[in-house]
Amino acid sequence: MLARAEKLHREFFRPVGAAPQPTWEPPVDVLETDDKVLVLVALPGVAADDTDAAIDGAHLVVGGTRVLPGALRHATIHRLELPQGRFLRRVPLPPGRYSDVRRSVVDGCLVITLTKA
C-alpha cells in the first residue's frame, strides 16, 4: 500500500515536460530453487524480444510495451481489459549473486531465469 502511494506521489509531482512514465505494472511470481531464481511475469501477447530485463542492485527491472497486434488495431473494441502501453516492474530479488539472465515466454508468461553464481 505504501509503495502504491509513493508511486502516485511521484507521478503527481513529476516535472512538466518530463518523459512519460510507464503506465502499468504486470503481476509477477518469484520462485527459487537451489541453483536459480525464476521470475514469472504475466504478459500474454508480449514476445520475449519485446521486453528488457536487467539486474539493478538487489532488484530485477522488467520493462517493455504491449500493443494490440497490427491486424486488430482497426477493429471495433467492445471490451479492453488487458493493459496496453509501456510497462515497468521493479522486483526485489532474494539475496545472492546471479551470473546469467535469460528470457523466454511460456503459456503467456515471460519467464526470466536468473542463474545463481
Where are these regions (language model features)?
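Alpha-crystallin/small heat shock protein
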Residues: M1-A117
